[in-house]
Regions:
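Short, solvent-exposed loop/linker segments at the N-terminal edge
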Residues: 225-232
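Bacterial N-terminal signal peptides
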Residues: 9-20
Length: 244
């Protein structure tokens, strides 16, 4: 079973909230790869209130400055709205993390590209990702980075960024490991139409460069089959792809 890795190795963060990142040109052949993931949105949505509790608490709403001696305190931050469009892309990104744990997507593009792909407009965006934490409380505590210096508080700055007005959270489970995503944005039109939390098991089709499919293992349901001349039998095969 995978374990939660030390934060310096586990987490990455995007600092360029307002930067327009051009779509990456990739000549590699892209193929679909299907993976079966278990969604955990009931648990994932618990983080929403935790974010707003930190944003509106005068004691908690702070970050270190680069000198690690003085703090920026965020007074009168607005609560974020929960955006169900952002949740949709956060859950897809969480599934992608099971293939490639990075802000870059398995198809070779930046995470920003999923906004265009899903037709979601925004003026600013940021993303927090994590893996290995079993509960909403545990991953939120890691993202808060209370005890980290300035260089280790990128996720915290995302959570407290006054330029964001909404968030969506994604959580999936695969092969004994939990994957979590927070998608932050500033949007002029926030989708607050509530949907039922998805806790089902579903097959996701993800785009991957063909060159990243590095192996194929096929397993039979039996080690041997005994047949007489003219007889037939049903053989069950299980195929497993190795990606990245």
């Amino acid at each position: 079973m995978k374990k939660a890795t030390a934060k310096l190795l586990l987490f990455f963060f995007c600092m360029s909230f307002l930067m327009v990142i051009p779509k990456k040109v990739n000549a590699a052949e892209i193929i679909p790869v299907n993976i079966s993931v278990k969604y955990g949105q009931t648990e994932g949505r618990k983080i929403f209130d935790m974010i707003n509790e930190m944003r509106t608490d005068s004691f908690d709403a702070w970050c270190w400055n680069a000198d690690n001696e003085t703090k920026t305190r965020y007074d009168n931050l607005n609560e974020l709205a929960y955006d169900y469009d952002l949740e949709r892309i956060a859950t897809k990104r969480a599934a992608e993390l099971a293939l490639l744990f990075d802000h870059g997507r398995p198809n070779g593009e930046s995470f920003f590209s999923i906004y265009e792909e899903e037709g979601i407009t925004y003026r600013a965006a940021g993303e927090n990702i994590a893996m290995g934490y079993r509960t909403a409380e545990a991953v939120n505590a890691a993202w808060r980075e209370d005890g980290e210096p300035y260089n280790g508080q990128g996720h915290r700055r995302n959570m407290l960024n006054p330029k964001f007005n909404c968030v969506g959270i994604g959580h999936v489970y695969l092969d004994g490991c939990h994957y979590w995503v927070e998608e932050f944005a500033y949007r002029t039109s926030v989708n607050t139409t509530e949907t039922t939390a998805n806790d089902s098991e579903q097959i996701m089709s993800l785009s991957v460069p063909k060159s990243k499919v590095t192996g194929l293992k096929v397993a039979f349901d039996k080690t041997s089959y005994s047949l007489r001349t003219g007889e037939s039998t049903e053989v069950k095969l299980t195929a497993k792809l190795t990606v990245f």
